[in-house]
C-alpha cells in the first residue's frame, strides 16, 4: 500500500507475558516503549513497564514502573504523552468510579519508578463501566478514549477537551525537509538530536522525500542535530530554543552536500574578540562542526584542501 513500509519485527530483550492481553505505546521518536504485561516478578496482574531502544535496533529488558503506579490489580492501555513524562493509563487497582478507570501521572526523574500520585481523571471521563485507551494529541488539547458506558458491553470512542490538571508539559514540534544542496530536491535522510548540556542521544527520526521530518523537543536549551544520508556529507548544526510557552511549531529545513570530487564546501568565518587572540564563543561551535565533519568523512574521503576565500 502506498505510504506504508513493509512490517518489521520488533525485538524486546527478555520479553515475557503471562497474560493473554498486552498493550504497547511507542514514543514519537521511537526511543521509548511503554507496555502493559503480566510477569512473575510483577506487582499484581497486568503492570506497566518501560523499554528503551538499543543501538542494535532492539528494545531493552522491560523495567517495571514500580509500586507508585502498579497495584495488585490491572494497569493497562498506557499512553505516553509527547513530553515523555506524562503517562495516561487505566486501572482497577485504585479507588475510582467503576470497573476500569483512567488515571494520569508524571515521571519525576529518569528512574521510571518515581512518579506523582496517580490522578483519577474524574466523572467526565470515568464511569461505572469500562473506560480505557486514553490518548491525546501532540498539542495536549484533545483526548480520545474508549468506554462501554453506552450499553455496558461494547466499546465506543469518545473525545473530550483536556482540563488543565490533566495536560502534559509543553513541547515544541521541529519540522522541515532535507534536500540536496545542489539540486534543491528533497531526499531521504536520518536525523539524530542531542542536548548540548547532556551529550546523549535525545531523539532520532527519518526525513522522507514525501513528508519531511518531525521531531519533538521537550525542553528549552541548545540542541545538536546531525543529518546524514547515503552519498552525502554529514550536516552538523546547533539550534537554540529560548523558551517553551504552550505548544509551538518551528520549521527548519536542512540541506546536504553530495559526495562529489571537486565540490567547494564553505565554512563560516572563525572570529576573534576585538583586539584579542581569544576566539569568540560562536567560533568554537564552528570549529567543533569542522572537526565533526572531518571525522565523519575522513575514512572514505581522505583528501581535503582548506583555504580562505
What does each of the following model-derived ranges do?
Residues 1-177, 181-182, 187, 196, ...:
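Short, conserved micro-motifs composed of acidic
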Residues 190-194, 226, 305-307:
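Beta-strand signatures of extracellular beta-sandwich domains
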Residues 206-212:
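Short, solvent-exposed loop/turn segments in extracellular or other extracytoplasmic domains
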Residues 219-231:
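A short, solvent-exposed beta-strand micro-motif common in secreted/extracellular proteins
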Residues 265-275, 287-309:
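Short, surface-exposed beta-strand segments enriched in small/polar/acidic residues
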Residues 277-285:
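Soluble non-cytosolic domains of exported or imported proteins
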Amino acid at each position: 500500500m502506498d505510504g506504508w513500509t513493509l512490517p518489521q519485527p520488533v525485538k524486546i530483550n527478555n520479553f515475557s507475558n503471562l497474560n493473554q492481553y498486552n498493550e504497547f505505546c511507542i514514543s514519537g521518536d521511537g526511543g521509548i516503549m511503554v507496555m502493559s504485561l503480566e510477569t512473575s516478578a510483577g506487582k499484581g496482574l497486568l503492570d506497566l513497564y518501560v523499554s528503551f531502544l538499543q543501538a542494535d535496533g532492539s528494545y531493552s529488558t522491560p523495567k517495571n514502573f514500580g509500586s507508585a503506579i502498579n497495584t495488585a490489580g490491572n494497569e493497562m492501555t498506557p499512553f505516553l504523552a509527547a513530553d515523555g513524562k506524562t503517562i495516561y493509563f487505566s486501572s482497577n487497582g485504585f479507588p475510582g468510579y467503576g470497573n476500569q478507570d483512567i488515571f494520569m501521572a508524571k515521571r519525576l526523574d529518569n528512574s521510571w519508578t518515581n512518579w506523582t500520585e496517580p490522578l483519577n481523571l474524574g466523572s467526565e471521563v470515568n464511569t461505572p463501566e469500562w473506560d480505557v485507551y486514553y490518548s491525546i494529541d501532540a498539542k495536549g488539547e484533545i483526548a480520545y478514549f474508549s468506554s462501554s458506558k453506552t450499553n455496558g458491553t461494547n466499546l465506543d470512542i469518545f473525545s473530550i477537551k483536556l482540563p488543565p490538571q490533566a495536560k502534559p508539559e509543553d513541547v515544541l514540534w521541529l519540522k522541515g525537509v532535507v534536500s540536496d544542496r545542489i539540486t534543491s530536491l528533497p531526499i531521504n535522510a536520518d536525523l539524530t538530536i542531542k542536548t548540548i548540556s547532556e551529550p546523549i542521544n535525545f531523539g532520532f527520526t527519518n526525513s522522507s522525500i514525501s513528508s519531511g521530518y518531525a521531531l519533538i523537543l521537550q525542553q528549552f536549551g541548545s540542541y545538536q542535530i546531525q543529518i546524514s544520508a547515503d552519498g552525502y556529507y554529514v550536516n552538523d548544526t546547533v539550534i537554540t530554543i529560548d523558551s517553551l510557552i504552550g505548544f509551538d511549531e518551528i520549521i527548519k529545513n536542512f540541506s546536504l552536500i553530495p559526495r562529489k570530487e571537486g565540490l567547494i564546501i564553505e565554512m563560516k568565518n572563525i572570529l576573534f574578540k576585538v583586539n584579542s587572540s581569544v576566539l569568540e564563543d560562536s567560533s568554537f561551535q564552528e570549529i567543533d562542526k569542522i572537526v565533526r565533519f572531518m571525522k565523519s568523512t575522513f575514512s572514505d574521503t581522505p583528501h581535503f584542501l582548506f583555504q580562505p576565500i
